[in-house]
Amino acid sequence: MGRIAYREADVDLMARMMRAEAEGEGKQGMLYVGNVIVNRVVADCGDFIDLRTVDDVIFHVQGGNYSFEAVQKGNMFYQRARETERKLARQTLESWRSHPAKYALWYFNPYAPCPPTWYDQLFRSIYGSLFL
């Protein structure tokens, strides 16, 4: 059994999100995004209470916005998943975890504007994204 229960539709959905959020960071960056998605399903705390599925996490709304910008903006998220990303998604759902995203629940682009509430938090930078 994987880290969480999932269906083939979850593999596809997660693969699309991993590509939309991190294609520019390569396979490793996409795996990190997948790690964050699975961690949110597992977390059951704070902002992620009652999120039990990949679908719940990806379409979660916080403060009036989707948690993942790609859902709101569309970009590559609404394109079909490619087999490369599907394999990465399956790998993450089954067992893959790595530092700095091993327990991460968020990530963001350090070069983009961010809300003031994000300042003074501990983070780790790798592959162009920051992990909290």
Residue ranges and their predicted role:
Residues 2-132:
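Bacterial extracytoplasmic/cell-wall-associated proteins, especially those involved in peptidoglycan
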